[in-house]
UniProtKB/Swiss-Prot annotation:
GO molecular function annotation: adenylate kinase activity; ATP binding; metal ion binding
Region (LID), start-end ranges: 127-163
Matching HAMAP family: Adenylate_kinase_Adk
Keywords: ATP-binding, Cytoplasm, Kinase, Metal-binding, Nucleotide biosynthesis, Nucleotide-binding, Transferase, Zinc
Protein name (Swiss-Prot/TrEMBL): Adenylate kinase
A GO cellular component annotation in the UniProt record: cytoplasm
Listed PROSITE patterns: ADENYLATE_KINASE (PS00113)
GO biological process annotation, one example: AMP salvage
Region of interest (NMP), residue spans: 31-60
Length: 216
């Protein structure tokens, strides 16, 4: 099984790229954000806890994140590989993932870091709208946002509570203080490929696929 990690700050496009690249390379796509949102929708104690952290722009504690993600990964048996989007987000999570994969006779094949400047991240996130049905993202000013409908499924659009300018800045502060060290962690292992996230979306996709194939 070939496992790939996507690193990048909120708004870097790693979610969009993860879906596209997973489809192109026939890999499973696991987005931590989606797992958390499903937990919130369940309305149980775990979901309420996750919701409280996300609304404050804080990272969900390691012990909760690790438990949720590893449980999901254990159920993905009939796949050729996995793209992990949004996990790990701390060195502790990375070490827990390494340990779990070793126990399964697996490892990390390549780590993709999508690099986008901070001011651009704030602009992207503050203007992001999301479909309530399929979670497709849109930017303020586009036709879909003007109409208030998703072009994929016709679902209604909304702005997430954690996409306000104030919360966005806090999320980025948390990211760069707690998650950025992962870049050096994986670089030291010779697994990291840094991709310029300011390029056209299609070009970013090409560069990511090339990096993954070269890393095999």
């Amino acid at each position: 099984m070939y496992n790939v990690i996507f690193l990048g700050a909120p708004g870097s496009g790693k979610g969009t790229q993860g879906e596209v690249v997973a489809k192109e390379l026939k890999l499973a796509h696991m987005a931590t954000g989606d797992l958390f949102r499903k937990a919130i929708e369940c309305g149980d104690e775990l979901g309420d806890t996750v919701k409280s952290y996300m609304e404050r722009g804080e990272l969900v504690p390691d012990e909760i994140t690790i438990s949720v993600v590893l449980k999901h990964l254990a159920g993905l048996t009939d796949v050729t590989g996995i793209i992990l989007d949004g996990f790990p987000r701390s060195l502790r999570q990375a070490e827990a993932l390494d340990e779990a994969l070793v126990q399964q006779g697996q490892g990390i094949g390549r780590v993709i870091y999508i690099n986008v400047p901070g001011d651009e991240l704030v602009r992207r996130l503050s203007g992001r709208w999301v479909c309530r049905s399929c979670q497709s993202p849109y930017q303020s000013g586009c036709a879909e946002v003007t109409k208030g409908k998703c072009s994929r499924c016709q679902g209604g659009l909304y702005q997430r509570p954690d996409d306000t300018p104030e919360t966005v800045k806090e999320r980025l502060k948390v990211y760069f203080s707690k998650t950025a060290p992962l870049i050096e962690y994986y670089r030291s292992k010779g697994k990291l490929s840094e991709i310029d996230g300011m390029a056209e979306i299609s070009e970013v996709t090409k560069r990511i696929i090339s990096a993954i194939k070269c890393g095999k």
